């Protein structure tokens, strides 16, 4: 029987050497589910709470023993005494939400709740003898996502003097995921050669992208375009560009202050000037997606950006929407953004994650399944991307095992799906005038 007999959590480490939580779910049948929870560096203020211990004598205050204790001493007894089956995903998720009793999961911690939620799903897949993506998506989950590859890191993810947090390449012209991954890897390695030729650093940031001391945003973009061409690919046809501006990280007192990351060369821009600047970049370069181009609370700015660019560029809300259906609903009603970034730990359960994806897709918004800057070897987001036919995944650069693990899982899934596997490429951006 798939009745849950034990739930156990422990403190482990993420890709930055910071503590995170791992949860295991055991059943009468012997089926097992294990999940590790990611962590973000730049976080939206409306995200669900990641519970940390705050004990400066352990891991500089970043320990997660409280979250571990909440799983082992509060959540686990409720599940075991309730005779829950691993197939009761929605019921278990709703029980944990009620047990927490707060709007932001601040009592038990979203990291504690999410670890259990994913581990339950993995145990269910193990019990049924099917891959996780098939358990979550049934026979409909056949679309491999376009990878959004973060090959240059800036902002809060590196020490590079660039305000924008991520510069991404999207190999939309590839015939399948396997080739898209190869294209990305070849761009990455060609970029390394170019950087070495300029005596620039090839050290990598949190998400595996390079973090050299470029002379500014346009220098970074021009260098990436050079790498695309060096890989034998055509910008604007085979490969498009994307930014994660993470604008909330440098928005202060109503001003987008690039000097926070770029020093004396950084400009200060008003909300309208920020929109103008992003439009200039879109007009100049083959950019297909911009994430968090405006501050999470600058709804007027977001609306202006959407009115200006929303028909030709994917405008992704990360800090804006934080995988929250209530906030997403407001965005849909007000015509703000046209895409949502999906981060499982922003909301805290698989059930709520799937609800956000469904709401977005029904409204004609795209959904981009995403990692966090503090990752683990857990590959759940790869399965979620396929299960929901999200069409896009953002899981870092072409280095660091914590990033590559997700890409390798997608390669396995593509092989398993065989002839039923789909890769839509440019058509994954279904709400743009291409």
UniProtKB/Swiss-Prot annotation:
Single annotated GO MF: phosphopyruvate hydratase activity
Active-site residues, record numbering mapped to chain: 207 (proton donor), 343 (proton acceptor)
Alphabetized UniProt keyword annotations: Cytoplasm, Glycolysis, Lyase, Magnesium, Metal-binding, Secreted
One Pfam family hit: Enolase_N
Listed SUPFAM superfamilies: Enolase C-terminal domain-like, Enolase N-terminal domain-like
Any one Gene Ontology cellular component term annotated for this protein: phosphopyruvate hydratase complex
Cysteine disulfide links: none
Any Gene Ontology biological process: glycolytic process
CC cofactor note: Binds a second Mg(2+) ion via substrate during catalysis.
Family matches, as InterPro entries: Enolase, Enolase-like_C_sf, Enolase-like_N, Enolase_C, Enolase_CS, Enolase_N
EC main group: lyase
Pathway stated in the Swiss-Prot or TrEMBL entry: Carbohydrate degradation; glycolysis; pyruvate from D-glyceraldehyde 3-phosphate: step 4/5
Chief location of this protein within or outside the cell: cytoplasm
PROSITE patterns tied to this protein: ENOLASE (PS00164)
Gene3D superfamilies from the UniProt entry: Enolase-like C-terminal domain, Enolase-like, N-terminal domain
Needed co-factor(s): Mg(2+)
Amino-acid positions noted as binding (2R)-2-phosphoglycerate in the UniProt annotation, renumbered to this chain: 165, 343, 372-373, 394
Job of this protein: Catalyzes the reversible conversion of 2-phosphoglycerate (2-PG) into phosphoenolpyruvate (PEP). It is essential for the degradation of carbohydrates via glycolysis.
UniProt record similarity statement: Belongs to the enolase family.
Record HAMAP family: Enolase
Name of the protein in question: Enolase
């Amino acid at each position: 029987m798939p009745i849950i007999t034990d739930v156990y959590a422990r403190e482990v480490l993420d890709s930055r050497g910071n503590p995170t939580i791992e949860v295991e779910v055991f059943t009468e049948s012997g089926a097992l589910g294990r999940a590790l929870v990611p962590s973000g560096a730049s976080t939206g203020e409306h995200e669900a709470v990641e519970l940390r211990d705050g004990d400066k004598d352990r891991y500089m205050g970043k320990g997660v023993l409280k979250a571990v204790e909440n799983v082992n001493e509060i959540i686990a007894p409720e599940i075991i005494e309730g005779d829950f089956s691993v197939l009761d995903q929605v019921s278990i998720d709703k029980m944990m939400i009620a047990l927490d009793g707060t709007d932001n999961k601040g009592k038990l911690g979203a990291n504690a709740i999410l670890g259990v939620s994913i581990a339950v799903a993995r145990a269910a897949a193990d019990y049924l003898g099917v891959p996780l993506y098939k358990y979550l998506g049934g026979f409909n989950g056949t679309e491999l996502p376009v990878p959004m590859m973060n090959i240059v890191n800036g902002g809060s993810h590196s020490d590079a003097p660039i305000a924008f947090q991520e510069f991404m390449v999207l190999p939309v012209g590839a015939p399948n995921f396997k080739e898209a991954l190869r294209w990305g890897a070849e761009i990455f390695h060609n970029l390394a050669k170019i950087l070495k030729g300029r005596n620039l650093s090839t050290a990598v940031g949190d998400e595996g992208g390079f973090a050299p001391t470029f002379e500014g945003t346009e220098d970074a973009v021009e260098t990436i375009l050079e790498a695309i061409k060096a890989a034998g690919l055509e910008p604007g046809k085979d490969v498009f560009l994307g930014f994660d501006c993470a604008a909330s990280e440098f928005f202060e007192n109503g001003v987008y202050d690039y000097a926070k990351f770029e020093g004396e060369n950084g400009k200060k821009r008003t909300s309208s000037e920020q929109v103008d600047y992003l439009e200039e970049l879109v007009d100049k370069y083959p950019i297909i997606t911009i994430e968090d181009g405006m501050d999470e609370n600058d709804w007027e700015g977001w609306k202006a950006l959407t009115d200006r660019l929303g028909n030709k560029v994917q405008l992704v809300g990360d800090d804006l929407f934080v995988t929250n259906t209530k906030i997403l609903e407001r965005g849909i009603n007000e015509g703000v953004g046209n895409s949502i970034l999906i981060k499982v730990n922003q909301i805290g359960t698989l059930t709520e994650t799937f609800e956000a994806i469904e709401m977005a897709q029904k409204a004609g918004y795209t959904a981009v399944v995403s990692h966090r800057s503090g990752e683990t070897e857990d590959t759940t987001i790869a399965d979620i991307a396929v299960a929901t036919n999200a069409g896009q995944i953002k899981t870092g650069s072409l280095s660091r095992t914590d990033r590559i693990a997700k890409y390798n899982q997608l390669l396995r899934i593509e092989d398993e799906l065989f002839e039923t596997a789909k890769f839509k490429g440019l058509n994954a951006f279904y709400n743009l005038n291409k």
